[in-house]
Swiss-Prot record:
The lineage of its organism: Bacteria, Bacillati, Bacillota, Bacilli, Bacillales. Keywords: Glycosyltransferase, RNA-binding, Transcription, Transcription regulation, Transcription termination, Transferase. It catalyses: UMP + diphosphate = 5-phospho-alpha-D-ribose 1-diphosphate + uracil. Belongs to the purine/pyrimidine phosphoribosyltransferase family. PyrR subfamily. Regulates transcriptional attenuation of the pyrimidine nucleotide (pyr) operon by binding in a uridine-dependent manner to specific sites on pyr mRNA. This disrupts an antiterminator hairpin in the RNA and favors formation of a downstream transcription terminator, leading to a reduced expression of downstream genes. Also displays a weak uracil phosphoribosyltransferase activity which is not physiologically significant. GO terms for biological process: DNA-templated transcription termination. A motif (PRPP-binding) lies at residues 98-110. The gene is pyrR. Homodimer and homohexamer; in equilibrium. GO terms for molecular function: RNA binding; uracil phosphoribosyltransferase activity. Transmembrane segments: none annotated. Its EC number is 2.4.2.9. InterPro entries: PRibTrfase_dom, PRTase-like, PyrR, PyrR_bifunctional. This is Bifunctional protein PyrR. Gene3D superfamilies: 3.40.50.2020.
Length: 175
């Protein structure tokens, strides 16, 4: 199967800058704004958007990471007792406007798990969703507030997001 580059490094940079502007417009600035990246690639995208917001607004927005592994219902994991230690949200989100940032929005199950983890942990003022790629095929009634690129795909296609921090390059590829 051949691969198709959907976003190269320059296009990804422009897309993340646009998403940063959209998030700022949505929130009317940076007041009470917290970016929460879903491990693994979402956390690096959140840091990139944080950097772009800092360029635009000349202020730093708190950015954290959420590991939702124990909240997934689509992985073959034993059903452990969920405790505060079974997921990580490393920034205070109480009464904040939280933007969950993920690399690919597909079935919606990662977002559902993120919401479960967040609401068990805290009570944000508002929660929004940003996805670099929305590929469709939802299994849950979930939609992103901020989308970098809508990419209609077949279910058997793979959408891969590469980030410099883990993959050595920034790109979005369909395989």
């Amino acid at each position: 199967m051949s691969e198709r580059i959907v976003l190269d490094e320059a296009a990804m940079k422009r897309t993340l800058m646009r998403m940063a502007h959209e998030i700022l417009e949505y929130n009317r600035g940076t007041k009470d704004l917290v970016l929460l990246g879903v491990k693994t690639r979402g956390e690096f995208l959140a840091k990139s958007i944080q950097s772009k917001i800092q360029q635009i607004e000349n202020t730093t927005v708190p950015t954290g990471t959420i590991d939702i592994t124990q909240f997934r219902d689509d992985l073959e994991l034993p059903t452990p007792k969920i405790s505060e230690k079974s997921f990580v949200i490393d920034v205070d989100i109480t009464d904040k406007v939280v933007i969950i940032i993920d690399d690919v929005l597909y079935t919606g199950r990662t977002v559902r798990a993120s919401l479960d983890a967040i609401l068990l942990h805290s009570r944000p003022q508002k929660i929004g969703l940003a996805a670099l790629v929305d590929r469709g095929h939802r299994e849950l009634p979930i939609r992103a507030d901020f989308v970098g690129k809508n990419i209609p795909t077949a279910r058997d296609e793979a959408v891969s997001v590469y980030v410099k921090e883990t993959d050595g390059r920034n790109a979005v590829i369909i395989e």
